[in-house]
Amino acid sequence: MKDLIGREISAVAFVRDYVEFHFDGPVLRSRVDPQVAVGEAVYCFPKPGSRDALCLVIGTTVQSLNLDDSRHLEFTTSNGCRVRLPLGAGGVLNFRADQVLQVG
């Protein structure tokens, strides 16, 4: 997972019931609604404004990544956005640089 630090987020994809963060190869998939903090404002997907806020991370790099008590995966981007991915019940984390990391 720490392999994502320093990587550029090349795309954010909204797919039916999940959101994907693409890193020119690796993909971070959130099956539980992500949150993004832009300054003091917090947007919860799929509420109004959340898609625009999530798109702000496209073209930025991951500066830090934290897994807190196995309940949330959070990363901060080079433009100061903080993305928080809740880990759903039974969520599994698997990561290889050439595969998909699925959260929730």
Locate predicted features.
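Surface-exposed, interaction-prone regions used to assemble/regulate multi-protein complexes
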Residues: M1-G104
